[in-house]
Amino acid sequence: MEESAPVESQGQLPSPHHGSLRRAVAAVLALDGESTLGRRKKRRKDSRPESIIIYRSDNEKTDEEPEESEGGDRPKEEEGEDFLDYPGDDGVWNMPLDSRYVTLTGTITRGKKKGQMVDIHVTLTEKELQELTKPKELSREAAPEGRRACQVGADQGPHVVLWTLVCLPVVFVLSFVVSFYYGTITWYNIFLVYNEERTFWHKISCCPCLILFYPVLIMTMASSLGLYAAVAQLSWSWAAWWRAACDMEKGFCGWLCSKLGLEDCSPYSIVELLESDNISGNLSNKDPIQEVETSTV
């Protein structure tokens, strides 16, 4: 009876199969943990947003509330600095190699907060940055040269005209859809203004008319803008065609809201950038090897 205890203890020793199973389970858990960390790293390596708009606060607000900005939320200017200066958790931003982030200063001409100064942090490639910083004299001199004659080349000629004719129905459909979308948003914003912010007489007179005439108004506007965009994209050169084809809605909704005095109803805001002499001067003083993270227009 005394020798039975060690025999039982020897029978309880883990077999090699149990050890291999435990090692396999541990390996699976380790791989699962690595895959989870890999997924987290991929989430952290999300591409940086292409652009962000920072609204400049008034000097009176900044002078009256300095303590609140220190103890509470940070001002939007600091958020813009963090957007430019600090990378993600893994220390690397996922952005193209030939692009850089610059700060463009402009004024909102149409849309919400009209007349306010804004700082736009946007991604620009080297080519786009060179076009943006091109001096005015060069652009003015290049315009008459392009108008002298319809030159034929790889980027301009009859083949481009043929291509624009083929794309005419496609541009019409795309412009119709985009105009329908922005027009519906504009109509809804105008309806909310007359229904919630205006007087009772506006509510009983204008709101029913907006609802009744919505199908006619939206179809007329979308069809007209689609036809205009399809005709306007006919061009002799690729560059002019691309500029016209990318502008589907032609800024009609913003223009209409500004004419009606309802800038807040615009589905977008149009920002007019300041002169590009500052950024061209800053880049000319820098070495080509040196990277420019922030520039001012």
UniProtKB/Swiss-Prot annotation:
Intervals, Extracellular compartment: 1-159, 232-297
Topology, Cytoplasmic side: 181-210
Membrane topology summary: Multi-pass membrane protein
Biased composition (Acidic residues): 61-70, 78-88
Compositional bias (Low complexity): 22-31
Entry keyword set: Membrane, Transmembrane, Transmembrane helix
InterPro entries per the UniProt record, alphabetical: TMEM169
Disordered: annotated segments: 1-88
Transmembrane regions: 160-180, 211-231
GO CC annotation: membrane
Cellular compartment(s): Membrane
Name of the protein: Transmembrane protein 169
Organism of origin: Mus musculus
Lineage per the UniProt record: Eukaryota, Metazoa, Chordata, Craniata, Vertebrata
